[in-house]
Every structure is written in C-alpha cells, then in structure tokens.
C-alpha cells in the first residue's frame, strides 16, 4: 500500500475509535453531542432545537438519529419540520415520495432513505444505503457514521 493509503486507513480507524468512545460515554448527553460531527454550526443548532421539539428523542435513539439528519441545513431549510409528527413524516405520503424529498440533493436523498431503512421503510431500489455507499463523499460518509453512533448509543 502506498503511504497515502496508510494515512487514509489511519484516519478512518481514528474516526471509528472516536465514534466508539461516543457510544461508550453516551450517558453524558451534553458531552456526547459536543463531540458529534456537524457540517457547520447551523447543523448543531438545528439539531438541538429538534431534540427539544421531538421530546421522544430522549428515549428513542431512532428519533434522535433522525433529528440529527433532519438538522442538516439543506434539509432543515427545505422542510416545515415543526409541522411533522415524526422527523421523517415529510418524506413520503399516500402518493409516494414527496416533492420536498425529490428537491434534496441526490446524496441527501440516499442519506434519508438509508436512515428510513433502519425502521424497515424502503423507498428506493437499490437501497439508499447501497446507493449512498457508492456515491457519498467523505463528509456525507461522516454524517452517516455519526448517525449510526447515535442510533446505537445503547449498544455497549
């Protein structure tokens, strides 16, 4: 392997070690959230607001993780989030995938679809997870990895 490959592997291993520590120390929620990967400050502020609005996020890691994704500025600014009973209620309706969902960038559509797949809701074939893994850039991968750490915080 080239040196560049070793550096990439070391960076990925470091990221997974950080995510593991987040899971281990998830009982201190303020500390837990301060170490999250956020695309920018607005992402973090949106996430904190959604956690207050969706009170069941405290006891439901799936809702917590959905709030993290919904807080992404591109999504948060496209959706009337405070009119939804659940964080992803806006994704599809009786007619299928909504125009709001279709208006998101393709990588974010895959991210939302992959998060829905955790609850056995499949809106794409091939799956959002499959398409995301083949198309996400490193920042989008980090968002997905962070999402998995949130929903699995009770794993240890």
Model-assigned labels for residue ranges:
Residues 1-107, 120-156:
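Extended, charge-biased low-complexity segments
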